[in-house]
């Protein structure tokens, strides 16, 4: 008997809600205000469960949202605060989205909270429209944080900011914008200025922290702060912008340096340059846009494990999948311009997002990097087995391009059942 049968059924129910064609969704809304209106209604019908919290912190940006949220979560937790964080998306299993202090929501609590949410979701559907996948998960997280009496709530924005469900919260006390890069161009683009405008939408009558440096983009943030009579704090950094951003927010919250240092030291996320095997070296990294893949390339070149460079002389094996639509060439360019690579193009398995056809990835590689060997696989596990078969002990395998791909193949080392049982992503 499957001990997590009810949990699996509950997750299937939430996933199935995506098969109702909605009047507005962030991926194709002609009237995005309707999308935000629906999210606001959903939370209002729930009694705005977030309003009990002492501080509500919302983090957006092209890259580093999850890392910043996680570091800040760890800092506050080390300082003895009751903190609940909502991450999006999850790598392997749904409970990884909802965390209070050191533990994810338990499978049983997840089932119970979804049961509480069902009549609220139904009311929203009857009064206006069926809530989106992201909205429903956000609602479940907020209901759980209320039950756990969290002092601090941290929310990772799904996409953009202005019309994201996170902006439907009854208030945002602190906002953070990591940076502006090129991702989700078909939704919030096509230019970086467009993207900056959308992300600036989380600035209300609050303080906004940012590590963005481009003057033309900072001007957009400053215009928003003038409109909302809020403050913009530019965070300077040398090496790690996400650490510095989280630390600056923590200092603003009057958290002592000792807790900030310990929080930074203990913060880690699955599929973020995660070394799952040392010989041969296998790394999971969920980089899924050009900026993140540039950073991954830099890290591969400069990092070492037990005195050995992550990328020694020889071949880099890459298992690669990508959400659609994305700029395949721009995403592959950092890796394929810098390494002697062999690519295993595949797809991810979740149904809520479109995966790029592996043949499209292969055709781009053949056109722009004709010397790079590329094989295509519909089954990511077949791609994994083939890569492992070809991998020599002195070589490196990187699994990248998608959180969903990394989270699926991560099961080879840490099973979904282990995560559900321990309520942690790491052993």
Stretch-by-stretch model annotation:
Residues 1-61, 70, 74-79, 125-128:
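Short functional linear segments
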Residues 55, 152-157, 163-176, 180-184, ...:
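Nucleotide phosphate-binding/pyrophosphate-handling subdomain across enzymes
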Residues 66:
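Residue-level recognition of phosphate/Mg2+-coordinating polar/acidic sites
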Residues 70-117:
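N-terminal phosphate/diphosphate-binding loop that engages ATP/GTP or pyrophosphate donors
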Residues 133-212:
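Flexible active-site lid/hinge loop adjacent to a nucleotide/diphosphate
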Residues 213-235, 239-240, 251, 281-282, ...:
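C-terminal helical cap/extension that packs against the catalytic core
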Residues 350, 420-427:
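Short, flexible loop segments at boundaries between secondary-structure elements
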Residues 402:
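Active-site-proximal loop/hinge segments that shape catalytic or ion-binding/gating pockets
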């Amino acid at each position: 008997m499957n001990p997590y049968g009810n949990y699996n059924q509950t997750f299937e129910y939430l996933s199935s809600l995506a098969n109702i064609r909605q009047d507005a969704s962030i991926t194709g809304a002609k009237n995005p205000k309707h999308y935000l209106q629906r999210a606001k209604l959903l939370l209002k019908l729930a009694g705005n469960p977030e309003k009990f919290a002492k501080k509500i912190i919302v983090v957006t940006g092209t890259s580093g949202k999850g890392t910043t949220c996680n570091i800040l979560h760890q800092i506050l937790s080390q300082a003895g605060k009751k903190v609940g964080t909502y991450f999006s998306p999850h790598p392997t299993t749904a409970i990884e989205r909802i965390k209070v202090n050191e533990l994810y929501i338990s499978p049983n609590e997840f089932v119970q909270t979804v049961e509480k949410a069902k009549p609220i979701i139904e009311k929203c559907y009857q009064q206006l429209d069926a809530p989106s996948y992201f909205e429903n998960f956000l609602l479940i997280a907020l209901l759980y944080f209320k039950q756990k009496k969290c002092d601090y709530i941290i929310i990772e924005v799904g996409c953009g900011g202005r019309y994201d469900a996170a902006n439907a919260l009854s208030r945002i006390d602190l906002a953070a914008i990591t940076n502006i890069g090129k991702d989700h161009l078909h939704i919030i683009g096509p230019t970086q200025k467009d993207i900056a405008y959308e992300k600036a939408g989380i600035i209300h009558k609050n303080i906004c922290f940012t590590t963005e440096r481009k003057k033309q983009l900072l001007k957009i943030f400053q215009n928003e702060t003038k409109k909302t009579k809020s403050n913009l704090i530019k965070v300077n950094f040398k090496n790690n912008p996400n650490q510095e951003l989280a630390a600056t927010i923590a200092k603003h919250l009057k958290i002592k340096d000792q807790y900030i240092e310990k929080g930074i030291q203990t913060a880690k996320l699955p599929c973020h340059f995660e070394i799952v095997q040392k010989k041969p070296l296998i790394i999971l990294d969920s980089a899924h846009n050009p900026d993140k893949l540039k950073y991954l390339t830099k890290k591969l070149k400069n990092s070492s494990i037990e005195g050995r460079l992550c990328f020694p002389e020889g071949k880099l094996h890459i298992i690669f999948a990508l959400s659609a639509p994305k700029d395949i060439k721009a995403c592959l360019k950092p890796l394929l311009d810098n390494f002697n690579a062999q690519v295993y193009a595949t797809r991810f398995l979740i149904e809520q997002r479109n995966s790029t056809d592996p043949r499209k990835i292969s055709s781009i590689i053949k056109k722009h990097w004709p010397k790079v060997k590329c094989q295509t696989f519909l089954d990511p596990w077949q791609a994994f087995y083939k890569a492992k078969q070809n991998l020599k002990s002195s070589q490196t395998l990187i699994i990248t391009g998608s959180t969903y791909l990394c989270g699926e193949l991560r099961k080879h080392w840490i099973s979904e059942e282990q995560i559900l049982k321990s309520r942690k992503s790491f052993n």
